[in-house]
Amino acid sequence: MLYRLARAGFFQLDAEKAHDLAISNFKRFTGTPFDLFYRQQLPHRPVQCMGLTFKNPVGLAAGLDKNGECIEAFGAMGFGFVEVGTVTPRPQAGNDKPRLFRLVHAEGIINRMGFNNLGVDHLVENVKRAKYDGIIGINIGKNKDTPIEKGAEDYLICMDKVYPYAGYIAVNISSPNTPGLRSLQYGEALDELLAALKTRQAELAAKHDKYVPLALKIAPDLSDDEIQQICQSLLKNKIDSVIATNTTLDRSLVEGMKFANEAGGLSGRPLQNRSTEVIKCLYKELGEEIPIIGVGGIDSYISAKEKLLAGAKLVQVYSGFIYQGPGLVADIVKNL
């Protein structure tokens, strides 16, 4: 009830202004009596994945807390893990505004943010300060002005800096809002990137006496053949997990709606079925060898369960959380 009232007010604002206000309030309320408005005590539902123990299988997807400013607040809401970022080596402003749009009737969101963030060094300081006993995933990307052929260098820079502080590292090569980025999902480009990341992972594991798993985040806009090729690269390079999926460019389910023609990636309920199909295809190829983190359109216990039955080991929410609030986390965790 409280969230529905708050949402009514937030939804009167521009989508990005509402997001920024929410982040600001979470920062302000953390550790004060006001965090009672969103703090939840949820049952323990531990899950083993990537050699880590997650308090429960419901995580916050990357993109909501890009700079790691509200990790404790999201932990208080009952998330079993929190993924922050996407972060890049250098700060960048992202794409021009407006760049975030609600498709309210479809419970969807279109964004073309463009990896706006304050840079990896800023994020690392926030992660170091966070008082959160759950798993923190750190999602890394490349700067917009880094040529795609040198993209691996940006991922390695970020990896070096976040490695000591991350529970796992998510490699984002699937955002549709950085020109050319999705080309890294294919063929030799993917193999070369994954090989470089695994080599650096081994070096950093020896240096820090700590093994931090790598998860690759992929797009939903892939053919079955392309997914199979990605799976071959994942297996060949012994990547620890795959996150399925990022946002979609497909607009078939929202055609004619306000903002449907805005450029960017679509998330939320319109992505629900397609992301589950991708998970099924991944599981067919990977089985239990490489765990899958399912994300895309989860807005209820039922849709979360569908992802788990399709083969996902963990799930993440973002758009569903925007529309439903912390109660969505409780609904899923309590019913598992």
From Swiss-Prot:
Pathway: Pyrimidine metabolism; UMP biosynthesis via de novo pathway; orotate from (S)-dihydroorotate (quinone route): step 1/1
Reactions catalysed according to its record: (S)-dihydroorotate + a quinone = orotate + a quinol
Subcellular location per the Swiss-Prot or TrEMBL entry: Cell membrane
E.C. numbers: 1.3.5.2
Named cofactor requirement(s): FMN
One Pfam family, short name: DHO_dh
Top-level taxonomic group: Bacteria
One of the record's GO molecular function terms: dihydroorotate dehydrogenase activity
Record: residues binding substrate: K66, N111, R112, M113, G114, F115, N172, N177, N246, T247
Residue sites binding FMN per the record: A62, G63, L64, D65, K66, T86, N139, N172, K217, T245, G268, G297, Y318, S319
Cofactor note as given: Binds 1 FMN per subunit.
Disulfide bridge positions per record: none
Keywords tagged on the record: Cell membrane, Flavoprotein, FMN, Membrane, Oxidoreductase, Pyrimidine biosynthesis
Membrane topology: Peripheral membrane protein
PROSITE patterns registered for this protein in UniProt: DHODEHASE_1, DHODEHASE_2
Biological-process GO terms, alphabetical: 'de novo' pyrimidine nucleobase biosynthetic process; 'de novo' UMP biosynthetic process; pyrimidine ribonucleotide biosynthetic process
Complex formation: Monomer.
Stated role: Catalyzes the conversion of dihydroorotate to orotate with quinone as electron acceptor.
Similarity comment: Belongs to the dihydroorotate dehydrogenase family. Type 2 subfamily.
Protein name: Dihydroorotate dehydrogenase (quinone)
Record gene name: pyrD
